[in-house]
Amino acid sequence: MTRVDMTETGNGGAREQRRTGSRVRSVLDRWRHDPGVWRRGTLLAASAVLLALLMVFHAQIPNKIGNLGSLTETFLPWLGVFIPVILVAAVLRRSATALIAALLPGVIWLNFFGGLVTDKSGAGGDLMVVSHNVNADNPDPEGTARRIAGSGADVVALEELKPGMVPVYERALADTYPYHSVQGTVGLWSKHPMSDSRPVDIRLGWTRAMRATVTVPQGEVAVYVAHLPSVRVKLNAGFTANQRDDSADALGEAIVREELGKVILLGDLNGTMNDRSLNAVTSQMRSTQGAAGDGMGFSWPAAFPMTRIDQILVKGVEPVASWTLPATESDHLPIAARVTL
């Protein structure tokens, strides 16, 4: 009796496979003998080509009109969302032209961002660093500090520190991090000795960047913390980022002048690695997320991360792993990395 059931089940599975194969062949036959399969969907095909051109030539989009180029580069990975839409529409339209055209932006997207989707992180590392924009209006600064301390980081950079809340962070982090320095609205906490802590002028008129020397068993490391000005999207002005861009240039100049060979930059740069306006910084440093990250590493907004505007960049240091930490009460996710010195 059991043999009969197994045979019937096997035969049923085989029949189902034959039916599926027959349906696929039927669809292919209809497409093959449809004289309009190459004529339909020209608008979809044109959309796919335009999408591909937008990704390839994004650097040519001018910033003179509302910083449109930087806005496009900030959300560049999300252009890939349109690829499956075009593919589905091409199938529904029964357009071979549109299907083939949709492969073009798909290949380009994979070339640009396919490597970021995979986990490139490794084991080990000499130093774990964390950066977090804690949000000036954070309703639970003490809880945020405890979570950051619980991450196991050796060095912690905090941005958007409200002056009245600095003592709260200092008390909550004191047991884990005996060395720290706060300059303006940014601060650095370390398990290792710190020296030469000072503000960095990024042309704002107040302090939102600093540097310090952290001495670890492998030697001295220059650690920079920066919070570049926010950008705004306005209906009458587009993507306003002039102040951010000027500050990025100043920060890049400060890093060029740095005398130590090992440099780590932690902070909220209010821009992605694709944003040309941050070239003064990104052209001389490596992103830990790009080199050794787990996924895209989107950090903002915390409720539904869509882009990575918080960065850990290094020079003379080898990234081992990079990732985002669980959310706190901030509107940004904390980001972390392990590096070899």
Where are these regions (language model features)?
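N-terminal signal-anchor transmembrane helix
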Residues: 100-146, 150, 197
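Soluble catalytic domains of enzymes that build or remodel membrane lipids, polysaccharides, and related
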Residues: 135-149, 160-341
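Structural signal for the C-terminal ends of transmembrane alpha-helices
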Residues: 88-96
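Residue-level marker for buried hydrophobic side chains located in beta-strands
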Residues: 128-130, 157, 265
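Short acidic/polar alpha-helix capping motifs at helix-coil junctions
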Residues: 32-35, 49-52, 109, 135, ...
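Metal-dependent phosphoester-hydrolase catalytic domains
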Residues: 3-88, 213, 256-258, 271-341
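Hydrophobic alpha-helical transmembrane segments
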Residues: 69, 98-100
